[in-house]
Amino acid sequence: MHALPLIGIAFLLYAFGYFVYSKYLAEKIFQLDDSRPTPAKEINDGVDYVPTNKWILLGHHFTSITGAGPIVGPAIAVIWGWLPAFLWVVLGAVFIGGVHDFTALVTSIRHKGKSIGTILGEYAGEKARVLFLLLLLALAILVNAVFAYVISLLFVKYPSSVLPAWLVIPLAVIFGFSVYRLRVNFLILTVIFLSILYFGIYLGSVSPIDVKPLAESLGLSPIMLWIIVLFTYAFFASSLPVWVLLQPRDFLNGLQLLILLILLYIGAVIANPKIVAPAVNLNPEGAPPIFPFLFITIACGALSGFHALVSSGTSSKQLEKESDARAVGYLGFMGESSLALAVIIATTAGIAMFSAEKFQELYSSWSSIKSSSLVAVVDGGANLLGAVGIPVDFGKTVIATLVVLFAATTMDTSVRIQRYILGELGEIYGVRLLTNPWVASGVAVLTSMALVLSKEGGKGGMVFWPVFGAANQLLAGLALLIGYLYLKRVNRPTLPILIPMIFVLFITSLAMAMNAWNNLMKGDLLLFSVSFIILLLEMFIIFESFRAVRRAPAF
């Protein structure tokens, strides 16, 4: 089997998903109507609610949902074979993941841009709302803590990525000011700034920045120094108006990823490498069973509950008109899925273009690939870029830089979402300080830092990461449940939401229960307790939601 047929099949399905299935959802299920004002136009506070061109907003949404998830997850999951990973990434995206993101986005704009936690309260009561918001808050803190550590680790491992990763920030501020205040030609600016960013990647490859001497002079490890820098940046980035940094940075990053994806796929078409991984491998050494763990290992690229936080947290507050939700919510997810597909191609075929034994070396066991997944992606992707004439070492710098950029984008979007959640909790409990964006951002950063520092070396978030995959997908199931409740309330067809909702809740509840049992058997009472509490919260929210369905008439 070679890579080209897989690429062709996948993109035919993506095209069907966007041009046919998302159109059906938009017109027949949600009945999008551009005459209905969006929250961005109704509120338009110039800070969080800002009507935005759909392609710029797509850039923000795409880069915020992407992060490292669709890279690491598929890179690990192909240990069970390329076929299960391929089917879940492509079919899952078309019929579940894209539906989930689109549903969360539309449901939020129909509720004044409120988060899915607040929307749940309207249907299932205040108690369910508060518990769900607390669950969302805990997941956001975990994402921030883990991504801060992972980005810092990447900066240390790939010092060539430091310069281009930080160069994008001042450039994005200048870009945003030029577009929104000076009204400079958008296309000309885009070409100029992209050229500067790619030159920055070249400079990074020839002038890597090692912060070890500075860190040691401050009595810190390089990783801890970067963690402090990242959270300082996130504090300001999450508090500033979205047009100042968030939108232009994410638009520029999104274009960089789009260009990289195009080059990767051109390289794959030119080289058409042979897939050296087995189609199916049910018993890899040390791996958990493929069912249900495939569905939570690939936690992005096929489906991700974190996307509901982005859709209802930042993107819904910037949507200019309802019809834009198809491009932002659904097409944005197809973009992420295409990245996950590129990772599958890179790790199962690109990795072996110059060494047939490389795949077996990296995928010899579950523990081996869990510690080497990014190596597999960077090396395999660089080989594919080599097919279009890009030197392999420079290709590694490009890929490592973009992994860092998207992880950082996800992190500061997550801090902003955490600020929104804290603000909502402040309104519920009358804590007015939390409704101040700067105060809420400070609390968000401090709580995430507290988790980081709870374990030596900044690894505090990694302690809880084993439960994230299942918890993230449970959140996706609950977000679909909220979309179902909305459609039920307005008397619209619910089957396209109900079927994926039942599937996701069943699969991920089973995985969470198995994780809880395994942790109990290993004597890890902390992770067992966390898993058990999340399962109880899920059952309570589902129970309260269906009680609400029974007692609330449609209108």
Curated annotation (Swiss-Prot):
Q: Where is the protein found, in the record's own terms? A: Cell membrane
Where are the bilayer-spanning segments?
1-21, 55-75, 76-96, 131-151, 160-180, 186-206, 225-245, 251-271, 290-310, 327-347, 388-408, 433-453, 462-482, 494-514, 523-543
- State one Pfam family annotation: CstA
- Establish whether keyword 4Fe-4S is in the entry: no
Q: Which GO terms describe its biological process?
A: cellular response to nutrient levels; cellular response to starvation; peptide transport; protein transport
Q: Could you tell me the superkingdom of the organism this chain comes from?
A: Bacteria
Which keywords does UniProt give here?
Cell membrane, Membrane, Peptide transport, Protein transport, Transmembrane, Transmembrane helix, Transport
Q: What GO cellular component is one of the record's annotations?
A: plasma membrane
| Record's function text | Involved in peptide utilization.
The UniProt similarity line reads: Belongs to the peptide transporter carbon starvation (CstA) (TC 2.A.114) family.
| UniProt-listed PANTHER family | INNER MEMBRANE PEPTIDE TRANSPORTER, PEPTIDE TRANSPORTER CSTA
Q: What is this protein called?
A: Peptide transporter CstA
Q: What species does this protein belong to?
A: Aquifex aeolicus (strain VF5)
Q: Which gene encodes it?
A: cstA
